[in-house]
């Protein structure tokens, strides 16, 4: 009889543990998002980004504008190295935060064997920092495109790769600007970000 109750008790504990694995408590709490304007980036536009991000994460703060890191300027092309910016930014936040740099100036990185490739944004997967620039965005719908770009790079820092769904915000730009064709995160990317604490529909 004692053996029977012992087996029953072990089974109950096992079932409870399996249920807890999928409980809401297991869902990650989203990190604090720090918005960092760079160079001559206007506070008005930075505040617009702040308001938009609060929709998906209320834990967001806006810092005052700072100069670009001195070692990030690439004189031959008169632009800033995104990888150098990220390296500098990630050293100025806590372990439970992720920082996004905002730029009007052109930014670049090394890609496909090209030493200095101009980009709209850069974020490592996963990572603590990313940077975006509106330099290459269309004049029409620039604010909307810029916000989509911010979400794209923050998606990378959360761990998302590029997505093959053409309407997904995680689509690879492939040297172009498909932002007007992107309407939101696809089902799979949405599910992943929700597991990271993002407040998406």
Predicted segments with their positions:
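Metzincin-family zinc-dependent endopeptidase catalytic domain
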Residues: 43-149, 157, 161
């Amino acid at each position: 009889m004692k053996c029977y109750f012992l087996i029953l008790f072990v089974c109950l504990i096992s079932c409870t543990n399996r249920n807890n694995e999928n409980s809401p408590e297991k869902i990650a709490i989203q990190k604090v998002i720090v918005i960092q304007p760079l160079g001559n980036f206007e506070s008005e536009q930075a505040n617009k980004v702040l308001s938009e991000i609060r929709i998906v994460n209320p834990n967001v703060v806006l810092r005052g504008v700072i100069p670009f890191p001195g070692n990030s300027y690439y004189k031959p092309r008169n632009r800033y190295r995104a990888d150098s910016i990220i390296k500098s930014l990630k050293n100025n936040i806590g372990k439970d935060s992720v920082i996004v740099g905002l730029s009007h100036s052109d930014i670049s990185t090394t890609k496909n064997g090209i030493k200095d490739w101009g980009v709209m944004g850069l974020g490592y997967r996963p990572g603590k920092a990313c940077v975006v620039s509106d330099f290459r965005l269309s004049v029409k719908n620039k604010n909307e495109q810029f916000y989509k770009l911010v979400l794209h790079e923050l998606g990378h820092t959360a761990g998302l790769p590029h997505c093959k769904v053409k309407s997904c915000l995680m689509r690879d730009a492939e040297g172009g600007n498909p932002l007007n064709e992107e309407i939101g995160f696809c089902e799979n990317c949405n599910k992943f970000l929700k597991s990271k604490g993002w407040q998406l529909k």
